[in-house]
Amino acid sequence: MSGAYDESAMSDETTDSFWEVGNYKRTVKRIEDGHRLCNDMMSCIQERAKIEKAYSQQLTDWSKRWRQLVERGPQYGTLERAWLAVMTEAEKVSELHQEVKNNLLNEDLEKVKNWQKDAYHKQMMGGFKETKEADEGFRKAQKPWAKKLKELETAKKTYHMACKEEKIASAREANSKGEASVTTDQQKKLQEKVDKCKNDVQKAKEKYEKSLDELNKCTPQYMENMEVVFDQCQQFEEKRLNFLREVLLDTKRHLNLTESQSYATVYRELERTIVSASAQEDLKWFSSVHGPGMHMNWPQFEEFNPDLSHAISKKEKVKRNHDGVTLTQVTHGAEHGTPQTGDRGSVSSYEKNQQYSAEWSDDEQPPTAAQSASETNGGNPFEEDSKGVRVRALYDYEGQEQDELTFKAGDELTKLEDEDEQGWCKGRLDSGQLGLYPANYVEPV
């Protein structure tokens, strides 16, 4: 404050009241706190937006992974469609949470940022214009009353000191009457001292009472002036409180997906797809595609035709890839109009659209060592170590054919070749056995 009065020149018996000199500073500080609270609100919204973004990405990754697993797996028909609908739900909910993130950042956070910029004006020397105006308003309102208060404190102190001096003088004068060593002249001087002190006490008391009366007279005006400035601060704070309340309501509206029509539609569609799954329909489909309902070209008597002698028999259609793994190309017709699935790798021994050899023979034997050697050009199969990649099994797998590997979840093996178009990889167990396994049954070590 100015040199007219000193805030420290107050009685030790002060209270925590707003009306005490300097206690208006808490109201001024509230303005600065309001600016900081706007920053806190923006940080809060920003952190929630990061959570929404992360959750959205997790849903997308989860959906992508499991859609691939289900599509490659042995599940079929309407139940497969229902299962995949759960992935569709995740994708749509992911989009909704991404939208939540965008609304939080582009609407709620920006709204607080713009309001804060309009409400608080920084000064070149630091602080805010609103804080300075409030502080100066309180100082001006308090200055006359604080000056009178300082005069009152001085008068009070003088009065109390005079009372103390009068008490000491009276005690000395009373004690001197019982002492023979005190002369009459000394006794007279002590009495005069007492009289003077009493006179000083009376004067100090009158001045003290006058100062108190003057302070009381200016107190109503002091209170009125202080309340005017305080009300201005209250109005400013009211705007901030109402604004942040509005922001919180907007934030709630953006976060509450249960109020979103799009969110409700996602789960209506999911339920409709799941409910539409039919075991009977799936069983009928499987029977017609892979069971007794399949078309069959039953053997019939055929006359010899020399023009067809060059035709390739079914057995000659069997091809061998460079691994020595037999793949057949027997294709079933669609006479019954049954739907055909795409060529996708399987996560089980049964594949969608898996093709099996149409030939069998009592003479079939496992390939001999000589045959294996010829298929590898006489090379050592273990020489492939240098290009192998170590992988770990995610699930148990029981090989269904001689050229398939068998392993347990957690086992490690070496991947020798990347996934082929049917979703299989060539690998080698630590025992040295070579064979095929489903690509999505393992992960890199």
Swiss-Prot record:
<keyword id="KW-0175">Coiled coil</keyword>
<feature type="coiled-coil region">
    <location>
        <begin position="146"/>
        <end position="167"/>
    </location>
</feature>
<dbReference type="GO" id="GO:0032587">
    <property type="term" value="C:ruffle membrane"/>
</dbReference>
<dbReference type="GO" id="GO:0007010">
    <property type="term" value="P:cytoskeleton organization"/>
</dbReference>
<dbReference type="Pfam" id="PF00611">
    <property type="entry name" value="FCH"/>
</dbReference>
<dbReference type="GO" id="GO:1900006">
    <property type="term" value="P:positive regulation of dendrite development"/>
</dbReference>
<dbReference type="GO" id="GO:0005543">
    <property type="term" value="F:phospholipid binding"/>
</dbReference>
<dbReference type="GO" id="GO:0097320">
    <property type="term" value="P:plasma membrane tubulation"/>
</dbReference>
<keyword id="KW-0770">Synapse</keyword>
<dbReference type="GO" id="GO:0060271">
    <property type="term" value="P:cilium assembly"/>
</dbReference>
<dbReference type="InterPro" id="IPR027267">
    <property type="entry name" value="AH/BAR_dom_sf"/>
</dbReference>
<dbReference type="GO" id="GO:0045202">
    <property type="term" value="C:synapse"/>
</dbReference>
<keyword id="KW-0446">Lipid-binding</keyword>
<dbReference type="InterPro" id="IPR037454">
    <property type="entry name" value="PACSIN1_F-BAR"/>
</dbReference>
<feature type="compositionally biased region" description="Polar residues">
    <location>
        <begin position="368"/>
        <end position="379"/>
    </location>
</feature>
<keyword id="KW-0963">Cytoplasm</keyword>
<dbReference type="GO" id="GO:0030659">
    <property type="term" value="C:cytoplasmic vesicle membrane"/>
</dbReference>
<feature type="domain" description="F-BAR">
    <location>
        <begin position="12"/>
        <end position="282"/>
    </location>
</feature>
<feature type="compositionally biased region" description="Polar residues">
    <location>
        <begin position="338"/>
        <end position="358"/>
    </location>
</feature>
<comment type="subunit">
    <text>Interacts with cobl.</text>
</comment>
<dbReference type="InterPro" id="IPR036028">
    <property type="entry name" value="SH3-like_dom_sf"/>
</dbReference>
<dbReference type="InterPro" id="IPR031160">
    <property type="entry name" value="F_BAR"/>
</dbReference>
<dbReference type="GO" id="GO:0030100">
    <property type="term" value="P:regulation of endocytosis"/>
</dbReference>
<dbReference type="InterPro" id="IPR001452">
    <property type="entry name" value="SH3_domain"/>
</dbReference>
<dbReference type="GO" id="GO:0048812">
    <property type="term" value="P:neuron projection morphogenesis"/>
</dbReference>
<dbReference type="GO" id="GO:0043005">
    <property type="term" value="C:neuron projection"/>
</dbReference>
<keyword id="KW-0728">SH3 domain</keyword>
<dbReference type="GO" id="GO:0005768">
    <property type="term" value="C:endosome"/>
</dbReference>
<dbReference type="GO" id="GO:0060088">
    <property type="term" value="P:auditory receptor cell stereocilium organization"/>
</dbReference>
<protein>
    <recommendedName>
        <fullName>Protein kinase C and casein kinase substrate in neurons protein 1</fullName>
    </recommendedName>
</protein>
<feature type="domain" description="SH3">
    <location>
        <begin position="386"/>
        <end position="445"/>
    </location>
</feature>
<dbReference type="GO" id="GO:0007015">
    <property type="term" value="P:actin filament organization"/>
</dbReference>
<dbReference type="Pfam" id="PF00018">
    <property type="entry name" value="SH3_1"/>
</dbReference>
<dbReference type="GO" id="GO:0006897">
    <property type="term" value="P:endocytosis"/>
</dbReference>
<keyword id="KW-0254">Endocytosis</keyword>
<feature type="coiled-coil region">
    <location>
        <begin position="183"/>
        <end position="219"/>
    </location>
</feature>
<feature type="region of interest" description="Disordered">
    <location>
        <begin position="327"/>
        <end position="390"/>
    </location>
</feature>
<keyword id="KW-0966">Cell projection</keyword>
<keyword id="KW-0472">Membrane</keyword>
<dbReference type="GO" id="GO:0005829">
    <property type="term" value="C:cytosol"/>
</dbReference>
<keyword id="KW-0771">Synaptosome</keyword>
<keyword id="KW-0968">Cytoplasmic vesicle</keyword>
